[in-house]
Each structure stands twice: as structure tokens, then as C-alpha cells.
């Protein structure tokens, strides 16, 4: 491959992200942009790193694309960095199945492909790729007819430069790491961080307490690296901002361009070098054959490597190389560089061998599936001279770095060191000498012998086999485990479908599907089947499936408190013991915090096992207690805080208000005296100063000002403490909020008053200054009251979520059973200690702690708080139970299937939490407005101050006329300043961005909470807002409009009743169909069992199935069945009847009290055998049976109604006709009618045939139908409707509808019970009720209406309140004091929250409420009113409106055609339809018994 630079990388700062949902949204949306190859978004660093094609995108366009999503995107550095790309040369190896244009288009659409050049004449293609995004092997897999061109590849490699272009876009990061005490600490950090994907290199310095890291920002962020270091137990701090760098010469050498191996593999490598050596590497991180191919491709092309064999099963690679040109360490790094961060490579063994030896020649031709196993030995060395744990750590740190040492554990107590090592790389003697070199006395045990390592010399026949001296063992099948992300599941039937079909496949041992998590865990034999094949099998079932590469590790995380540790030796003892346990991936113990962080595989080991292991070491371990309560949702702490602040402020505010009222009364009294006696200004001053409160204690300090100051101080700095904290935090983060405004207003008023009071005292003024000490107490009283009421209201908005969280159980009773399922012991454990597979006992009245399956017992379970299902649900062995539901009567034993965060309840809680914290698009407008609001208000306040000062000095009469409480004892200048200052502070007090900020989130929280209580899960603000804009509702048919399972509609007996009875026919048919796996057969069997009131049927032999036609078999042993069953009396036993129609649904027959049966039947030993045929017309004709015209016409009528008609023959005589159909849900017609009455267009879209679709549409009242639409075409249909300018809601059961649900403006998934498809839709209806579709749109409209009302309140309040406060309306007498402004401000926030709480009064309309409407408004339609569109084409096929003569002609033609052929054209069916409504209510009713 030839390196070049056709891609750039840019890092964009993104503001406005609040949660991981924002990160996913940006990655999904920008990832779809044309020209974007890869994007990595970091919430912590508020940045997005994008790899893109510079020919299609620029940094500016990417910034604008993120801006358009509602986030603030900033380009601090607009200069992009180049990203390494490679050139792949492809050639045609077989006749092309696809045209060149299609191949080029396919390749260009692939992420990571930057360019494609096609040469049809030379039958080749040149593809430019980004190797970190897509590999050459993946390109070849996309186009099977093309393969890598080795000739061109080698030619290009030979002419290339000595050094390839370095990987651009790498970043250098330096971090300060505290708490490191020895080299073991540095090794731990380097080992942990060095394995992370995206980390290229790391060096930790113990002396400098510093880590230097080189990483790729598009794969990992600095914050993630910091978290990983802290997870090990060391505090880490970023010293300086990361900066981009270029690689050095050594790294350039490692990345040197090399040709790709030939298609023959590594076997056709260049001849061996004179000094060839063979080495075995252990490789962790390989998941599939693609990994094997990538490593072999990369290594086999290096000049100094003669051959390589990689084994996926043994996780190893054997490399033959020239030891004079390259070292094993370079080879190890070369393997890790194939996919940085994915592979973890260690050296297992190295054997030098001359090239002429048999082993070398055999190694070149080594088969892929044969590899030597790495060999390890253990030695115990006696060590004397150790005095403390520092000695222990020193020995462990030095020896652990020696080549070949796998692990070391030094015991200070026993004076020993236990070392596990690779005997091919080292031996006990060098290890003993190394310890002695450190100053200790080291002695090997007396009986110590050098381990004998037998290495089998590989031969041509058996290369690198183990020693032949060992007995040959029978290989047991290997079990591997993989995880597959499954999308499109909506209910338990989807789960059962996947599990049932996968278990049938060879090589698959077990399957466990988690519906809520959308994940399947599969155990398989890697020699038989691979994960990608399993994913393809799931896709064939109609679901989306992707192999989760890294899901197998770290899927269990445990936080423990460990008590009893005293030193670092204790820490090491716990860590080394646990990491040796199978199933534990990682363990980190922090001595300072007494905490252990453990990652484990729940399938192999559980939390109780880990705690027990630590206990056996002499320590006490317990779970870190987590707050499972919903206290953070009910705002109790905030309510208590603001209540305290309000009471403190109120305590000091009441005297201040008393003083203010007293002064207002006295000022009014003086003004009256002045008006009556016309006193001079000097007399007014004397009169004013003679008042008690105006008397001066000190010159310039009056009693009034002193009392006001003393009362203001505690309020300002105690009652207002929380405001100062919040304001400081806001300003520190360079933002301004409501708290900043409040602190500004109160601090300015307090500081101004204090300054002028001090100045007056300094000048010994005779006239007391006018102060504003009364402003802060009054402001804080009303603001604290507002916050108190606001948090009380907010607590109410989260009641639904708090109720869900409170359902979670805290403890579980785990029982132990013996082989006979008898109870041996019980144990109460914390619910977080429950492991998958545990047997749990749930007593009556108890909560189910986890999801599980009942293994013993019967009971009724209340699931109403989770599913909304009012009636208790019966549970028996095999039934699934949900965490949080309540057991009513009867004890149950359940086996845990999903625990911890995987339970259904946890997933629903997580979904509702994410929904309530997500933002609606309308909220983005409010957020931007609030961002500019505070600076704008501060500016308006300053302008108000200046304007009134200017007006006052220009025209004092205006201030004199409108200044409340003005008297001439105050100087003009002081009056002007006081009036302007008062207006300015009032503007600060009355302005409130809080009401804007609360308008949307409070309504969204209440709306989603109310929805959850009513079984409607809405995923956040965006779908909640979007649903009210919907103009078209598209329904899927199967499982949505209909029940999704076929049922028997009618049974017609076609023989005289004295020949064979109806019940006998049902017994024979039920027995015959019981062996069928076809859904129609299952429906027939179920119906027969219900009619005969039995669970057992006869015996079926010689069963044969002919797909597309029917079945044949022989039935016996039905006489006993008929004798035991409580059979019904035959009605109207008319001998001349040739056909009896019996309704399968509404028939009501009284049970017979007696039955006449021939004695020989009941007592017969050899029962009669019946030859049975069941199937369609073609099956009957094949078997030589003649179908009469009457029967054929009856079948035509059923088929016209969208039913499947099957015929039954017993002993070569046509005996019955059975009509089967998927029935319409009872509420479907009502739901469609209501949606239409709401002004919405309703469309039916189905993959079924047009006849069935037309029939269903006519029953529910839908006039527009898209029939015979493939699942892949449903997306196109939705998109087509959207292109017409319509907002589309897609309603489906999610099995084949998930792409269309994702494409729709609002995707609504209908589930049964709690089985919810959280990835397939925006709105999930827990109950299988179509009226919830109406309720979800109705709730959306109510919520959006409430949001708009809230915005009107907030905007009108600010638009009117601010001008009033600024004094604009003084001419009409509107004047506000600062305390009035603060009261109004508090009232605005409370009013918005209370307005949102009105949504809690919402009641979902019920079926009974809807049924109160007049029955004349039913929505059934005649065929002529229905427009059917077939397939992907948009050609409308309207039913023709024919005249009477045309109808008679067409009916006759249809009858003649029915005798000639079994296939009906669309037109013949459509024209032969009578009016549907007349059929449903007229003579041809389903509950009639018709005799032909």
C-alpha cells in the first residue's frame, strides 16, 4: 500500500452539550455528513475531533453543521492536520457480477475511503483508504470479485521513499501523577493506559511524578486517559493543554510502507535468512478471522520476516524472522501497530534455529491451526535481609521487569519470593543473582532442579506439535462467547424468535437475549461458527445485528470497601490473588481510601465469590453503599436550604419593613404639615431631624440608619450566602445567571448605602443620608420564598421517576437447592450481590429484585406500576418476571436472568432519566436567549441610571413629581441620585431569565413523567415536541393494526353430519396439525383444543409437509379423546344439508348431558386409522380430489376477505374447509377514527398482498394503503411522504419496521407488557393498545401548548416588567420599589412551574370515553373509497366504480376464472368485491351458519 495524505483532522470546541445523549446525537448526525470519515466527541473536554475529506468538507462547514444542530461550535485553530492514508491496488480475479460504476459507487460510500480510480481496460482499481477507519481486507470483502494486486503493490513499494509519511494528528500530553511510591506503580500505570485504544506511547517518570503520553485524539480524549489513571488509584492532573506533534525517525521507521501479502498467504514468503529465529507471541484482543488476516498481512510484508502463522483459538502468533536485522521487541510493537490500542502483545517464547534445520523449513510451511503453547514455570526463592515493605516493593518492581518474568510475589513474613517465569527466556539462577545484586541474600531451595523444557522439533508432517512423550488427549469442544448488538426487537416474541432459531444452528451452545439492552450473548464453538456468521443469521430473521468487538471485557464492575489493610503488601496480596482468578480482568486496590475497583466476567465469577476470596485472605470486604433513594429527585435538600434562607431573611426583614412603614407614615405626615402651614426648607429639616428615628447617635449616624445596617448585615451575608456561592461559581466559569443579577443588586445597594453613611459620619453631616439598607432584606425574602416554592414544585415534576426508582428492591433471598430441587439453605443478600443464575425466593407481598424466569410455584403478580396493566398477571414455571413487580399470593422460586443495570426496571428508569434531562428544540432558543439576558439587563440598568441622572439635572420637576416620599429636606442632587439608583436596582431585581429557562424543562419533565405513568415512554423533549407537528400517521399492519397471530375464523363441514361429526373432524385435524411448525397449523391446533376442551390429542404418524401446498399424515387414537371430552350436541342434523357454516368465534353451544357412542368404539383395542390431507386447491388436485363449484366459490369469498382457506380430506373424502386470518384489534377502527377527527391523515403500509391489505383497511376505515412493500422500501415510502412537506409518525411493532421508525419524524413502537424497543423508536407504548397512539399525540399537543403558555408568561413578564422598573410608565403613575421587583421576579418563576404542574391533571382518554361518541361515525369504508398503492411504485390503484351491467359481467367472469385457475389477478378480485360494510352488517355475517 502506498501512503499519501487525502484526509484531514480538525478539532472543534462544542459548547452546550449537557449529557451523553448530546454526544451521541452529534456523532450520529455529523457521521452521516458526506465526506466525514470518523468523529469522536468528548463531553468532558467539550470538543469534537473529525477526520474528513478536504475535497468535500472544510473546517468551517463542519463547524456550521454542528451549529445547525443547536450547539455552539468554535474553531480555535482553523488549520487542519493531515491524516495518514494508504493506497490499495485491486484487480479482477473472476468475471464481474456488478458493473464498474456500481463498484465505484459502493466503494465511495464506504466510511474511510477517500478516493477510487477505476480502469476497466486494465481490469483494476486503485482505492485510497484511511487505515485507522477501514482496512484493505474490508475493502476486498465489499467487492468479492476484486482482490489485492500483489504485483502492483510490490512495484509501488519498491519505488517508494525510504520512510513513509508519519501518522499525523497525534497529540502529546503531559500529566502530573501523584501517589507513586515505587516502580511497581509506574508499571501499573503504563500497563493500564498503554492498552487503551488510541494511546500510542506512554512513559511514566517516578522521579518527576509525571506521565508523558502520545495519543490519537479521534480515538480517545485526554479526560478519558486521566480517568483511567485515577481508576488505578493515582490522582492525575493535566499539566498543560495537549499539543499536536510529528513522529520521530524511529516511529517513521516503524510505519514504513510495505507491500501486502499475496493471496496465497504467508507461505509464499521470501526464502529464509541466514540467521532465522522463531518466536511465539501471545496476542490478546483478536476477535475474528479478520484480525488474523490483518496481522498476517501486515507482518508478512516486512522484509525481515520470512513467515508468520496466527492462531485465533490459541491467541498466539509464531513469527520466523532475521534476528540480525530486527529484535523481538520491534516485532511486538509492529503487531500492536496493526490496530493501535486493540491488540495487547507479549513475548511467549523464542527459539533460535539455523535455517538448514528441519524446523525452519517446516516453519515456513506451518499450517494455520497448529501452534505451540507458551510454557511457564514457578520457582520459590528464599530471600534474607528484607526489613520493610519498601524492600518488598523494590524487589517486585525490579524483578517484574526482567525478560520472561510473568509475575512475582514477595512475602516479608515468610522471607520468600514466588516467581512465575518463561523457561525459554530465563531461569531461576539469573533471577536469584538479580536479587543478590540488589543487596539481599537469595538462595534457591535445596531440591530445586532446573525445569526440563522439551520443545518438539517441527517436521513437515507435524510442525510445532507438543512433545510426543505426552499422552494424546481427546480434545473437548472449545466454548467461546461473543456479544451481538441487536436492533429492531420490540417484545418477548422477538427474543424467543432469535433464541429459538440460533439454538438450532450447529456450533451454538446457548443464547441469551436482553431485550431492553438490545444485546445477545452467544456461546459457540469457534471451530464450527464465527460471530459474524451468527450476526448474519440474526439479520436473516429481520433484525439488525452488529458484533460488539469489546463487549466481552469489563462487563462487570464491582466497587468494594476493604477493611484490615495496613501496608502496600496487603494491597499487593489482594490484587495478585484476585487477578489470578479466572474471570477477573482487572483489580485495583487503593490503600488510602480502603477501596477496591474490580472488573470481572459475571459468567465466570460473581461479586459474592470475590468478597469471599478477599475474606479468605484475612480482610473484610463489603459493597460500597449506593444511594438507591430518589432524594435527589424530590429536592428535599434544596427545599430545606431555601426554607432556612427564607426564614432567616424574614426574621430580619419584618423589623426593616416596620421601620420603613413608620418612616413612610411620618414622611406623609410632614408633607401634610408642609402643605397646610407652608413651612420653609429649614423648618422642614428641623422638623424631620426631630423625629425619634432620625435623631443622630453620632454625627451623620441616625438611629434609623444604624438599625437598618444591623438588620441588613445578617441577611446580606447569612441569608444571601447561597446566592453568593452560586454567583461566584457562575462567574468563575465565565457565565452569568439570575444569581449574578441578585448579588449585583443587593451588593450595590448595600455597598452604596454603607459608603454614603461612612462619608456622612466623616463629614459630620447634620442631615442624615438616604440609604438603601432596606432593599437587601426585602429582596432576599421574596427571592428565597420564590426559590423555596420553585423547588417544592420541581419535586412534584419528578414524582413519576421517583416512584419508578422506589420500586427497586434492596435485598434478595438467595436459596440453595439440591439435585431434587429441595431447599437446603437461604441467605439474605444485597440486591447488587445477586449473580446471574442465582435461585431467588420471593414470598407473597415481596418485590422481585431482578428479572428472572420462574422455575417453581404459581402466583399472581402485580405489574401495574411498571406496565400500567391493572389486572394481576398469572405466573407459572417458565414465565418471565420483572424486577420491581410485586408478588401477590404464593411463593415463587425464580432463576435470575438479568441483574443490576440490565434489569427491565433499571433500563426504564435510565430511559425516563435521559428523557427528562434532554432538551426540546424550542429549549435551545431559550438557552441562547438566557445567555445574552444577564449582560443585557446589566446594560439596561446602567443606561437607566445614567438617563435618570441626566433627566433629573435637566428637568428636576419630573423627578420631584414622581419620586415617592420626596421632601424638601433632601438636596436635589441626592434626590436625583437616589431616584436614578432606585430605578436602576429595580431593573436588576425584576429581570428574570429563570422563567425563560424553566418554561420548557419543567413541562418536559411533567409531560414525560405523566406519559410514563400512563404506559407511554417518550424519549426526551424532541419527540415530545415533534409529535404535535405530525400530519400523517403510518400504521404497519401485522402486529400493529392486527394481533399479529393467525386465528381460525370459520370451520365449514362439507359432508353430511351422519357420516362424520364436526367434533370428530376437529379431533382429526387438530391431531394432524399438532406436528406442524407453520403458524397456520399452530392456529388450527389451538382452535381444536379450545373447541374440544382438551390439552391432549390423538396420535399422528407418517407426517409429511410439502411447502406451499399442505400436509399428509395418518391419525389414530381419537376415539378415546372423543369419549373423554365433554362433546357438544350437533345442531340441526339435517340429512339433506351439503354444507354447514359454523362461526369460530361467536358460536355458543350448550354442553350435552349425554352422548351416544358405539360400545365397540370406546372399548376397542385397535382404534381406527384415518388418512388425512390438509392444504390448498393445488394439494387436493395433486392427490386426485375434485373441488365442487360451491366449495370453490366459498374459498374465493374467504380469499377476497383476506383470509387463508384450507381444505380437509379424511380417507380421500373432502370433509371440511377452514378459514384462517389475522384478526383486527378491537380498538383499531376507533383509534383510526379519532386520529382522523384530530385532522391527521392515516395510512396503512404492509408487506402483505393487496387483497388482505384492502380488507383490513376497509374494516378500520383507512382509505390510503401501501401494499406489498418490502421492509427496505418502507423507509423510502416514509421519506417520500416527508418530501411532500409532511411530518410523519410511523407506528410499528419494530420487527421489520425499525428502519422506518428511525426515518420517521416520530417513531412509535408498540410492545406487549414491558418488552420495549428502546432503540427502534422515539415513543414506546408499553401496552399493546392502539389508543395509546392517540394518547401520545394528544399528550404531546397538551405539553407543547403548556410550553407555549409558559413562554408567553415569561416573555410578557420581562417585556412589561423591565420597562416599568426602568420608569418608562411614570407618566401614568406606575412606579416600582426594588422589593416590589424582587417579589414580581419570584412570582414569575413560581407561576411558570405551577403552570407546568397543570399537566399532572392530564388524564389519558379511555376506550369507554371514546365510545360515548355517536355510533353513526364508524370509520368502515367500502372498497371504492380505498386507494391501494402496490410495491415501491407510487401508482395508485383505485377501485373502479362500475355500473350494474359491468358488475354482473365481472362477477360472471370471476366465477368462470375460478374454475380454470387457482390464481386470481388483482383486478378480478377488486371488481368482484361487494361493499364491505354491507358484508359486515348484512346477510353474509361471520356468526351465521350457512348451508349450501
Curated annotation (Swiss-Prot):
Protein keywords: ATP-binding, Cell membrane, Cell projection, Copper, Copper transport, Endosome, Glycoprotein, Golgi apparatus, Ion transport, Magnesium, Membrane, Metal-binding, Nucleotide-binding, Phosphoprotein, Repeat, Synapse, Translocase, Transmembrane, Transmembrane helix, Transport
Amino-acid positions noted as binding Cu(+) 4 in the UniProt annotation, renumbered to this chain: 388, 391
Region feature PDZD11-binding, mapped onto this chain: 1478-1492
Motif Endocytosis signal: where in chain: 1459-1460, 1479-1480
UniProt-listed CDD domains: HMA, P-type_ATPase_Cu-like
Sugar-modified residues: 678
Compartment(s) of residence: Golgi apparatus, trans-Golgi network membrane; Cell membrane; Melanosome membrane; Early endosome membrane
InterPro entries hit by this protein: ATPase_P-typ_cyto_dom_N, ATPase_P-typ_P_site, ATPase_P-typ_TM_dom_sf, ATPase_P-typ_transduc_dom_A_sf, HAD-like_sf, HAD_sf, Heavy-metal-associated_CS, HMA_Cu_ion-bd
Protein family (similarity comment): Belongs to the cation transport ATPase (P-type) (TC 3.A.3) family. Type IB subfamily.
Primary role: ATP-driven copper (Cu(+)) ion pump that plays an important role in intracellular copper ion homeostasis. Within a catalytic cycle, acquires Cu(+) ion from donor protein on the cytoplasmic side of the membrane and delivers it to acceptor protein on the lumenal side. The transfer of Cu(+) ion across the membrane is coupled to ATP hydrolysis and is associated with a transient phosphorylation that shifts the pump conformation from inward-facing to outward-facing state.
Domain notes: The nucleotide-binding domain consists of a twisted six-stranded antiparallel beta-sheet flanked by two pairs of alpha-helices, forming a hydrophobic pocket that interacts with the adenine ring of ATP. The ATP binding site comprises residues located in alpha-1 and alpha-2 helices and beta-2 and beta-3 strands, which are involved in van der Waal's interactions, and Glu-1073 which forms a hydrogen bond with the adenine ring.
Protein name (record): Copper-transporting ATPase 1
Native source organism of the sequence: Rattus norvegicus
Lineage, uppermost ranks: Eukaryota, Metazoa, Chordata, Craniata, Vertebrata
Amino acid at each position: 500500500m502506498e501512503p499519501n495524505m487525502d484526509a484531514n483532522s480538525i478539532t472543534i470546541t462544542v459548547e452546550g452539550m449537557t449529557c451523553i445523549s448530546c454526544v451521541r446525537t452529534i456523532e450520529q448526525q455529523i457521521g452521516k455528513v458526506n465526506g466525514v470519515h470518523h468523529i469522536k466527541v468528548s463531553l468532558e473536554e467539550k470538543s469534537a475531533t473529525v477526520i474528513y475529506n478536504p475535497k468535500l468538507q472544510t473546517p468551517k462547514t463542519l463547524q456550521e453543521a454542528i451549529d445547525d444542530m443547536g450547539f455552539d461550535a468554535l474553531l480555535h485553530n482553523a488549520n487542519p492536520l493531515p491524516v495518514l492514508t494508504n493506497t490499495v491496488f485491486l484487480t479482477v480475479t473472476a468475471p464481474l457480477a456488478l458493473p464498474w460504476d456500481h463498484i465505484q459507487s459502493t466503494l465511495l460510500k464506504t466510511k474511510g475511503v477517500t478516493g477510487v480510480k477505476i480502469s476497466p481496460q486494465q481490469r483494476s482499481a486503485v482505492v485510497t483508504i484511511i487505515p485507522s477507519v477501514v482496512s484493505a481486507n474490508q475493502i476486498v470483502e465489499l467487492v468479492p470479485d476484486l482482490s489485492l494486486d500483489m504485483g502492483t503493490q510490490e512495484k509501488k513499494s519498491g519505488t517508494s521513499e525510504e520512510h513513509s509519511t508519519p501518522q499525523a494528528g497525534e497529540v502529546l500530553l503531559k500529566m502530573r501523577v501523584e501517589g507513586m511510591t515505587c516502580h511497581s506503580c509506574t508499571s501499573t500505570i503504563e500497563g493500564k493506559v498503554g492498552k487503551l485504544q488510541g494511546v500510542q506511547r506512554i512513559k511514566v517518570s517516578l522521579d518527576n511524578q509525571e506521565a508523558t503520553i502520545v495519543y490519537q485524539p479521534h480515538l480517545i480524549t485526554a479526560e478519558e486517559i486521566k480517568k483511567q489513571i485515577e481508576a488505578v488509584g493515582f490522582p492525575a492532573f493535566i499539566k498543560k493543554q495537549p499539543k499536536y506533534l510529528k513522529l520521530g525517525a524511529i516511529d517513521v521507521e516503524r510505519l514504513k510502507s510495505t507491500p501486502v501479502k499475496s493471496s496465497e498467504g504467508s507461505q509464499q514468503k521470501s526464502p529464509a535468512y541466514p540467521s532465522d529465529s522463531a518466536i511465539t507471541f501471545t496476542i490478546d484482543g483478536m476477535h475474528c478471522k479478520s484480525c488474523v488476516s490483518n496481522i498476517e498481512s501486515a507482518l508478512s510484508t516486512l522484509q525481515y520476516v520470512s513467515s508468520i502463522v496466527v492462531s485465533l483459538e490459541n491467541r498466539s502468533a509464531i513469527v520466523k524472522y532475521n534476528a540480525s536485522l530486527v529484535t523481538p521487541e520491534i516485532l511486538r510493537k509492529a503487531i500492536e501497530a496493526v490496530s493501535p490500542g486493540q491488540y495487547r502483545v507479549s513475548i511467549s517464547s523464542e527459539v533460535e534455529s539455523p535455517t538448514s534445520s528441519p524446523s525452519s523449513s517446516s516453519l515456513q510451511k506451518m499450517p494455520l491451526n497448529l501452534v505451540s503453547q507458551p510454557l511457564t514455570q514457578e520457582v520459590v526463592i528464599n530471600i534474607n535481609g528484607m526489613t520493610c515493605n519498601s524492600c518488598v516493593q523494590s524487589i517486585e518492581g525490579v524483578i517484574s521487569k526482567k525478560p520472561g518474568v510473568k509475575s512475582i510475589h514477595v512475602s516479608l513474613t515468610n522471607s520468600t519470593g514466588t516467581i512465575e517465569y518463561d523457561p525459554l527466556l530465563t531461569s531461576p539462577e539469573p533471577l536469584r543473582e538479580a536479587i543478590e545484586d540488589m543487596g539481599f541474600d537469595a538462595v534457591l531451595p535445596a531440591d530445586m532442579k532446573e525445569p526440563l523444557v522439551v520443545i518438539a522439533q517441527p517436521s513437515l508432517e507435524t510442525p510445532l506439535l507438543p512433545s510426543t512423550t505426552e499422552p494424546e488427549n481427546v480434545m473437548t469442544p472449545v466454548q467461546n462467547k461473543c456479544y451481538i448488538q441487536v436492533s429492531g426487537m420490540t417484545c418477548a416474541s422477538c427474543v424467543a424468535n432469535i433464541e429459538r432459531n440460533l439454538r438450532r444452528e450447529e456450533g451454538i451452545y446457548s443464547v441469551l437475549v436482553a431485550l431492553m439492552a438490545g444485546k445477545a450473548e452467544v456461546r459457540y464453538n469457534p471451530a464450527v461458527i464465527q460471530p459474524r456468521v451468527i450476526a448474519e443469521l440474526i439479520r436473516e430473521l429481520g433484525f439488525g445485528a452488529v458484533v460488539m468487538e469489546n463487549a466481552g471485557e469489563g462487563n462487570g464492575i464491582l466497587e468494594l470497601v476493604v477493611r484490615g489493610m495496613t501496608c502496600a503488601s496487603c494491597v499487593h496480596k489482594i490484587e495478585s490473588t484476585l487477578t489470578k482468578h479466572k474471570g477477573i480482568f482487572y483489580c485495583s486496590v487503593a490503600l488510602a481510601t480502603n477501596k477496591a475497583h474490580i472488573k470481572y466476567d459475571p459468567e465466570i465469577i460473581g461479586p459474592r465469590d470475590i468478597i469471599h476470596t478477599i475474606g479468605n485472605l484475612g480482610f473484610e470486604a463489603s459493597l460500597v453503599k449506593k444511594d438507591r433513594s430518589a432524594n435527589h429527585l424530590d429536592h428535599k435538600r434544596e427545599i430545606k436550604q431555601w426554607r432556612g434562607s427564607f426564614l432567616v431573611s424574614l426574621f430580619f426583614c419584618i423589623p426593616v419593613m416596620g421601620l420603613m412603614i413608620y418612616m413612610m407614615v411620618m414622611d406623609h405626615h410632614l408633607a401634610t404639615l408642609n402643605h397646610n402651614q407652608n413651612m420653609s426648607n429649614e423648618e422642614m429639616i428641623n422638623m424631620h431631624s426631630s423625629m425619634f428615628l432620625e435623631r443622630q447617635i453620632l454625627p451623620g449616624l441616625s438611629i434609623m440608619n444604624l438599625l437598618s445596617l444591623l438588620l441588613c448585615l445578617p441577611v446580606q451575608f447569612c441569608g444571601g450566602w447561597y446566592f453568593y456561592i452560586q454567583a461566584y461559581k457562575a462567574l468563575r466559569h465565565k457565565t452569568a445567571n439570575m444569581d449574578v443579577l441578585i448579588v449585583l443588586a443587593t451588593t450595590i445597594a448595600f455597598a452604596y448605602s454603607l459608603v454614603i453613611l461612612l462619608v456622612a459620619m466623616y463629614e459630620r453631616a447634620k442631615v442624615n443620608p438616604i440609604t438603601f439598607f432596606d432593599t437587601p432584606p426585602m429582596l432576599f425574602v421574596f427571592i428565597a420564598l420564590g426559590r423555596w416554592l420553585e423547588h417544592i414544585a420541581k419535586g412534584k415534576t419528578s414524582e413519576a421517576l421517583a416512584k419508578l426508582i422506589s420500586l427497586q428492591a434492596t435485598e434478595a433471598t438467595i436459596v440453595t437447592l439440591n439435585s431434587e430441587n429441595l431447599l437446603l439453605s437461604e441467605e439474605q443478600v444485597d440486591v447488587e450481590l445477586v449473580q446471574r443464575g442465582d435461585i431467588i425466593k420471593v414470598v407473597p407481598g415481596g418485590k422481585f429484585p431482578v428479572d428472572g424466569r420462574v422455575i417453581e410455584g404459581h402466583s399472581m403478580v402485580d405489574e401495574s406500576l411498571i406496565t400500567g396493566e391493572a389486572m394481576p398477571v398469572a405466573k407459572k414455571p417458565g414465565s418471565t418476571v420483572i424486577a420491581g413487580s410485586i408478588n401477590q399470593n404464593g411463593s415463587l422460586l425464580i432463576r435470575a436472568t438479568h441483574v443490576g443495570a440490565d434489569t427491565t426496571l433499571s433500563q426504564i428508569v435510565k430511559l425516563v432519566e435521559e428523557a427528562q434531562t434532554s432538551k426540546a428544540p424550542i429549549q435551545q432558543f431559550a438557552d441562547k436567549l438566557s445567555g445574552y439576558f444577564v449582560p443585557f439587563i446589566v446594560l439596561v440598568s446602567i443606561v437607566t441610571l445614567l438617563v435618570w441622572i441626566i433627566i433629573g439635572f435637566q428637568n428636576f420637576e419630573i423627578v420631584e413629581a414622581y419620586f415617592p416620599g420626596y421632601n424638601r429636606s433632601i438636596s436635589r442632587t441626592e434626590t436625583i441620585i437616589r431616584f436614578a439608583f432606585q430605578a436602576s436596582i429595580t431593573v436588576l431585581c425584576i429581570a428574570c431569565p429563570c422563567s425563560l429557562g424553566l418554561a420548557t424543562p419543567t413541562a418536559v419533565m411533567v409531560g414525560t413523567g405523566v406519559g410514563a405513568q400512563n404506559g407511554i415512554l417518550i424519549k426526551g423533549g424532541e419527540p415530545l415536541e415533534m409529535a404535535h407537528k405530525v400530519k400523517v400517521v403510518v400504521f404497519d399492519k401485522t402486529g400493529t393494526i392486527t394481533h399479529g397471530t393467525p386465528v381460525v375464523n370459520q370451520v365449514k363441514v362439507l359432508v353430511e353430519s351422519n357420516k362424520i361429526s364436526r367434533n370428530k373432524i376437529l379431533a382429526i385435524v387438530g391431531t394432524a396439525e399438532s406436528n406442524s411448525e407453520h403458524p397456520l397449523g399452530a392456529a388450527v391446533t389451538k382452535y381444536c383444543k379450545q373447541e374440544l376442551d382438551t390439552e391432549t390429542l390423538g396420535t399422528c404418524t407418517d407426517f409429511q409437509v410439502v411447502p406451499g401446498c399442505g400436509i399428509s399424515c395418518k391419525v389414530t387414537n381419537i376415539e378415546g379423546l372423543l369419549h373423554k371430552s365433554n362433546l357438544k350436541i350437533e345442531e340441526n342434523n339435517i340429512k339433506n344439508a351439503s354444507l354447514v357454516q359454523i362461526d369460530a368465534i361467536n358460536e355458543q353451544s350448550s354442553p350435552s348431558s349425554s352422548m351416544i357412542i358405539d360400545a365397540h368404539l370406546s372399548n376397542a383395542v385397535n382404534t381406527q386409522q384415518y388418512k388425512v390431507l390438509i392444504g390448498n386447491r393445488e394439494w387436493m388436485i395433486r392427490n386426485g380430489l375434485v373441488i365442487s363449484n360451491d366449495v370453490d366459490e366459498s374459498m374465493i369469498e374467504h380469499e377476497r376477505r383476506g383470509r387463508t382457506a384450507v381444505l380437509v380430506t379424511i380417507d380421500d373424502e373432502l370433509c371440511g374447509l377452514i378459514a384462517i386470518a389475522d384478526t383486527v384489534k378491537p380498538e383499531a377502527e376507533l383509534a383510526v377514527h379519532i386520529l382522523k377527527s384530530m385532522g391527521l391523515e392515516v395510512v396503512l403500509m404492509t408487506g402483505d398482498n393487496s387483497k388482505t391489505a384492502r380488507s383490513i383497511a376497509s374494516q378500520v376505515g383507512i382509505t390510503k394503503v401501501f401494499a406489498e412493500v418490502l421492509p427496505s422500501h418502507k423507509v423510502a415510502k416514509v421519506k417520500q411522504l416527508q418530501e411532500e412537506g409532511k411530518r410523519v409518525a410511523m407506528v410499528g411493532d419494530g420487527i421489520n419496521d425499525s428502519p422506518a421508525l428511525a426515518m420517521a419524524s416520530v417513531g412509535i413502537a408498540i410492545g406487549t407488557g414491558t418488552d420495549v424497543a428502546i432503540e427502534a423508536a422515539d415513543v414506546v407504548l408499553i401496552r399493546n393498545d392502539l389508543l395509546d397512539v392517540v394518547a401520545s399525540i394528544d399528550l404531546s399537543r397538551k405539553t407543547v401548548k403548556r410550553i407555549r403558555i409558559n413562554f408567553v408568561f415569561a416573555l410578557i413578564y420581562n417585556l412589561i416588567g423591565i420597562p416599568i422598573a426602568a420608569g418608562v410608565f411614570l407618566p401614568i403613575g406606575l412606579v416600582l420599589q426594588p422589593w416590589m421587583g424582587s417579589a414580581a421576579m419570584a412570582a414569575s418563576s413560581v407561576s411558570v412551574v405551577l403552570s407546568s404542574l397543570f399537566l399532572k391533571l392530564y388524564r389519558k382518554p379511555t376506550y369507554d370515553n371514546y365510545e360515548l361518541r355517536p355510533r353513526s361515525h364508524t370509520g368502515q369504508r367500502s372498497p371504492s373509497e380505498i386507494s391501494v398503492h402496490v410495491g415501491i411504485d407510487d401508482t395508485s390503484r383505485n377501485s373502479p366504480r362500475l355500473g350494474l351491467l359491468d358488475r354482473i359481467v365481472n362477477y360472471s367472469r370471476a366465477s368462470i376464472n375460478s374454475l380454470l385457475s387457482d390464481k386470481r389477478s388483482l383486478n378480478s378480485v377488486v371488481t368482484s368485491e361487494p361493499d364491505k360494510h354491507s358484508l359486515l352488517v348484512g346477510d353474509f355475517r361471520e356468526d351465521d351458519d350457512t348451508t349450501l
